[in-house]
């Protein structure tokens, strides 16, 4: 469905601006002030649209997955030969959606096709049953994704459908998060190596296909240019959107992504959000050997001399994809200077 910016599930607004990677941007502090509050971690209000929207739309999606799984449980493989594959697809979607929500809010109510059949059932579900920690949530998420790995085929004929590699990748990612145990202040206090080993199994199953089903593009830009949609080996799974499809909103799009561009007429009339931090820009610095400066990348300060700064230092070329820098090529066209 169409996702307006206030309801979008997008890492830039819920991840980058909450970290040291980016600033909110926009026309000022009052422009989407809820995101500013998240950036400075002050006066965060849970029921403001920009905060409540992703929660609401997340559970709208969860409700649909649960209805689909309940309906699938009522048919037989004989009557519906695709039952297993479709169940795997929905399990993946539910696991991936819960993963996103779990990383944002940590303690969330787990609602599934068994415990959330009625409004009353859902109302009575706690986000911390019996005061438990969040391990049980990770276990549910991983269980969904591992079931998807079991049920899904290696290849799907229809574009956009989830395959086994997508489930492997998502299961590995969830296990990696689960392995790093955190205390109440989100500090890592333990690393569970057995869980890391479980993640490594799925990772190896993907990387063992390098040169065949998966691999790196010869040109980094191919991951982002529209002519390569659904056609690169780097893409594990691509969400499908549509425009000019007859809907009242003009398309089924993730509107939050539309704010993620510099305000630059005539190319982008809006909206100048998601401004890269100096720390993030510095992270692209390299030594004379072209390798990252892991320990010293943030030692230099621009102090208003950005032109000299970029001339005097060397950077990973992917910086041009990530940031719009005045006087330098924008994205992948060397003749288009920002």
Name what the model sees in each region.
Residues 38-41, 119-122, 256, 281, ...:
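Intrinsically disordered, low-complexity regions
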